[in-house]
């Protein structure tokens, strides 16, 4: 089934039972609340009887009919059931579908337990070709009842794979989810399957065949039409729907509004919740209450949403204050301030940068001491002892510093403020003096070894690190810094590192989650190198990387992920079922999976293509950027029931099925995660630049950071001589 056909079917009004004009209806009786997803879908035609309790439903059901005893108390309470009730059903020859039961005849049910790594896997052939054996589904927020039941149709198990459990089912810890009871005429779900809309079970298109099987079992011999419904969280447009002429400004406005609707801006009234969140595993917990006020940036901004979806369809939030996310997001607010004339958002942009550089631990302490080796650097996050005895603000990722600075550059230009110029240049120089002779800084530095070794140890080293994910955006900021200061080490070291990296491409490159993200990251420094030195060689470097990246751009505009050579990556797909969910990971299992990644690749490709187009005026980049802009406008989240998600972009999108779906193997940032910085900030910012018909390079052309160069070089490079 094509994505276009599937999408049209999912957006039909909820219809299931035979049309009212037909004399025949399905003989179904419900014991469920009137708000149950399945009941509401079936009841659209008024063809299904409903009662409040299992006992009443069994008593009122016509002989030989199908009765659905649904789990209204889920997940706190199991569905009340007993022997006499089943005896009455048997005497009436009823066929029962029973969810989350309190008791089963002849089978011992364990206490309810929650899934952690387990996903739902098709374990039989009852669903036919629509859902073949070992197909993977997601029951979000699943709590189930362990039971020993043979021949289950669906099971919960920890498995690796994108769509299919590629290593099969594990030898143990496989839990029945849907099975026919040995006594017959009783189909049991050990969890609640009927909240498939509310809890956003995925892929949405897979749950139609599940229900068709269940209802066919309940009504043998009857023709069961396909189940269709509107997902509660869905893409804004289908793959073939005509986009509005103003779709870009709509996407921009909704994307910036999302920060406020999701309560990402911390407000003083609930600031204490940040401290309370440290008790959550990995500081991931329930989202801010929608009734709480949205902040103004002065208390910082949360990292974003975790990929964990709860049984009510809400998602957990990452309660971290991260330098990169805040700096990047400040640009989004600043663009809104200019484009929409929104003074509150301009203020938020300024406040976020003030928080980073003046009012938080991120740039204070050793980072504010000129005698310290970490002087000028910005810490990764504000959490003390975030990992064992290591403080989050004592961790220095170069790429995170770089992206935060890029956001500050944009915000300063849009706000026409020199307020952060000195701090910005100080951070640029701090990163430069921890970059080696050859132009490589390495993946990250930590406070303790940095203080022990001193900055000169790194400045005079000859490390090599062919990892654009970690290196490329610092190179871009260094090229920008050279343009505005003329300080030669910014250019010389960077140009050398880029030359070495291009000579090493692709065989010696080290990839993080995939090869496409490394290519996407290289676009920005290569485009800005053309700005500084427009040579045939530099244009050829840019074209080579872009051509290889765009070789995997789908007709829809999506950029497909690709895993790099074995042995050259950090976070590849899990190689065993047991490895699933234990580390950061790519969201595909093998090359060819139709997945685009909006956290690591697509977002940075959008920015890189935009800057490449502006630098070269070549159609290759402009046309690819336009295709990507249309695609991103289509897949932006739309949801009336979850305003905290409306206007966002999830990390993963499966562009053939046109759904939010992936392997979700990443331990921290899975398929449904939303990052305020990396993703939301850059997608809205590029849309903003397209509205203003400018580029990041041109937008920031009037920066006055050079005014602070001489004093800072004397302070930070004492004893060093430069040609």
Where do the protein language model's features map onto the residues?
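Well-ordered alpha-helical scaffold segments within catalytic/enzyme domains
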Residues: 234-243, 327-343, 403-419, 472-488, ...
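CBM-like carbohydrate-recognition segments
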Residues: 562, 567, 572-577, 625-723
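Low-complexity, Ser/Thr/Pro/Gly-enriched N-terminal "stalk/linker" regions
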Residues: 223-325, 347-391, 425-426, 430-453, ...
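Solvent-exposed loop and edge beta-strand segments that line ligand/cofactor-binding
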Residues: 309-326, 338, 383-403, 454-471, ...
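Extended, well-ordered alpha-helical scaffold segments
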Residues: 206, 244-262, 267, 272-280, ...
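Extracellular ligand-binding/catalytic regions of CAZymes and related secreted enzymes
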Residues: 25-27, 37, 69, 97, ...
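Helical hinge/lid and interdomain linker segments adjacent to catalytic or ligand-binding clefts
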Residues: 26-108
